Structure formats: structure tokens, C-alpha cells
Amino acid sequence: MRLPRLLFVFIASSLVVAGCADESPPPPVPAVLSFDDGWGQVFVANLDGSGLRQVTPTVGDVSSDSRYASSAAVSPDGTQLAYTRGGRFIELVDLDSGETRTVHEGGYQPVFSPDGARIAFSSGGGISIMNTDGSDVRVVATGDSGFGAAFSPDGSRVIFNVGGYIVEAPADGGQSKVILRDQFWNADPSYSPDGSTLVFSSNRGGNNGSEIYSVLVGGGDITPLTDTHAVHPKFTPDGSRILYTRATTLSGEAVVDISTANRSELASMIPDGSDQKRLTPRSITAEMPSIGGGL
């Protein structure tokens, strides 16, 4: 009677193993890059710039068309896109089906939390956070000048710009604290995926423009990463590169003085500022990168 029992246990164990193998998680969605063209259209592409496609409708009159789209953000899993429509509606797009719905009225510059469950955004009341479906809207930092929010890697805090200062607040509400305050205009704060480094744009170069800088979280020397006009830094999900917007001439030369620029493009660099290279084609203007998926 012993052998059949052992045989039964062996068969049952094999079925459990086989079942686990069949239930392995699906492969991750490839990394998705989003940006807007500064003229009311939002695009997505692969992280190397290939596979470019327009996600939002083509806008006629940029000054009055309610479909004007800007400030897009890709969800962490790369399946959804949030963006601002008409300067006041937050829209959510399924990147596979193309289905679009309005999840909030009265906000702009949406950004996803690291787990994809919440969206932080700017509004007349300050920085707010809501569930991805638009429910449970909460103001976490008051003041009508707060904008450009980004979550910390663990989702517990949001960092943003208030009048040229970089400020951080608990994502569940609480006392805000100033992270960087000096005589310069500092904006576009964003954390590295491991939370060790903060990147931001600032006019501290004194060249009638803005450059990208990095500083260790907790303090330390501020390190310049670009010496030409650049804004909107964002780390790739694996932390290996920083994507950003840079200003150029019509011929594609990066400029120092913003008054000499004719267009914008996306570029990428290694986090120490080296290996700077154009990412988007010269046939289109591009700004405000966001990255999701790929992990």
C-alpha cells in the first residue's frame, strides 16, 4: 500500500508545479515614451525613439481648440496615458484600445504614483492626489503656485515647484517642507528610481536659460549635467539614463540662450551628464518626456 501513496503524492506535486508554470506572470510591456509637441498633440514611442505614433486628436486652433493636449504621463506598467486636455481636464487613455475618458475637471500636469493606483496633479488649490479613476480627490499641498509634481520612488511623498523653490509633501497629507530654496529659479524636480538622487532644472548657470542639475537626496553639492538650455529631466525606469527637453536651432544645434532657440526636442544622457544625444526625430518638436513600462 506504500507505493501507490508515494506515487499519488508524486503525481499531485507534479500537477502543482505544472500549474505554477502555467500561471507565470506575463512579460512586461516594453518601455513607452510619451511627450507633447507643444502644439496640442501627444505622442508615444519606444524608448529609442522608434515606433512613433500620435495618441490625441490633431488640434486646429491652438488658442481655442478644447482638444489641446499637453503634459502627458505614462503609467508605470506602460499601459495607460494621462494628459491634460484644454488646460483643465485630465484624460486617461488605454494605449492598447485607444479608449479615452475624462477622470477629473479642474487640474493639469498629471503624474502617476509608482504603483499606478493614484495620480498627482496641479490645480488652483495646490497639489492634489486622486485615485486613477478620479475618485477620492485630496489636496495635499495648498497654494496656487505649486506645479510639476512627481512622486518619490516609494510613493509616500510628492515633490514639486512653488515659486522657484522645490518643496516636498507627504502623499497622504501633512506638513510640507522646502528641499531647495535659493536665489535661483528651480523647477522640474524628479527622483532617481533608487531615491538617492534628485534632478531638476535651474537658471543658476546665468546664461538666459535653464540647465539640468543633480544633487544627492539629503544635501550635498549641486552638480551641473548640461551646459545648454534643458528642462523636464526624467530618469528611465532602470535609472540608466535621464531623458529631458532641450532647446535647439532649426538646424538642430543645442543652444545656451533660450532667446536663440527655434524648436525643442527630446534628448537623453547618462546620469553623470555624459553621452548626450538626440532622441526624437527632427521632423517633430517634442517636450515634457514621460516613461513607463519596461520593468
Please report, for each region that a protein language model flagged, where it lies by residue.
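Sec-dependent bacterial lipoprotein signal peptides
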Residues: 1-18
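Sequence signature of WD/YWTD-type beta-propeller architectures
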Residues: 20-295
